[in-house]
Each structure stands twice: as structure tokens, then as C-alpha cells.
């Protein structure tokens, strides 16, 4: 399982972005978290290569109808927490 850290910038707070991200995570069998941080949304995502790629593409194309992603930063990470599901915090 690979682990990714994603920071998503743009109109991503107050528009249902975390809710839709959680739905996408369930669709693509992704574990981890999504949360609002300052002026962006932070996502820790764990899954297999294909599922992660599809999930990240869907999220960065705008997870919710009212969101608008201007840019994002993606990096590999090694989260020590053992996730059993995907949560919005």
C-alpha cells in the first residue's frame, strides 16, 4: 500500500469538498483523512497504485460541484497511524 500527502488549494472550503472527498475515498477503497487547514485542504491517502491514482485525479479535478481547485501539492509520505477507514476531521 502506498501513502500520499495531498494539499489542495483554491475554493475548497465551505463548499462540501471534504464530504465529496470522503465519498470518493470510499469509492476507490482509500484509507486516511481529509481536513481543512488554513487556506487549503489536507489529505492523507493510503491505497494501491491504481486506486490512489484514480482518487487523486478525481479529487484534484474538483471533488464537489461548487469547488474549484487552482493547484495542489502531492508527495509520498510514511504515516505512522494505522487507518481502518477514511475520515473527515
From Swiss-Prot:
It comes from the Bacteria. The active site is at residues 18, 36. Its EC number is 3.6.1.7. The keyword ATP-binding does not apply. Keywords: Hydrolase. One of its GO terms (biological process) is protein maturation. GO terms for molecular function: acylphosphatase activity; carboxyl- or carbamoyltransferase activity; zinc ion binding. The keyword Phosphoprotein does not apply. InterPro entries: Acylphosphatase-like_dom, Acylphosphatase-like_dom_sf, Acylphosphatase_CS, Carbamoyltrans_HypF-like. It is an enzyme of class 3 (hydrolase). Residues 3-89 form the Acylphosphatase-like domain. It catalyses: an acyl phosphate + H2O = a carboxylate + phosphate + H(+). Belongs to the acylphosphatase family. This is Acylphosphatase.
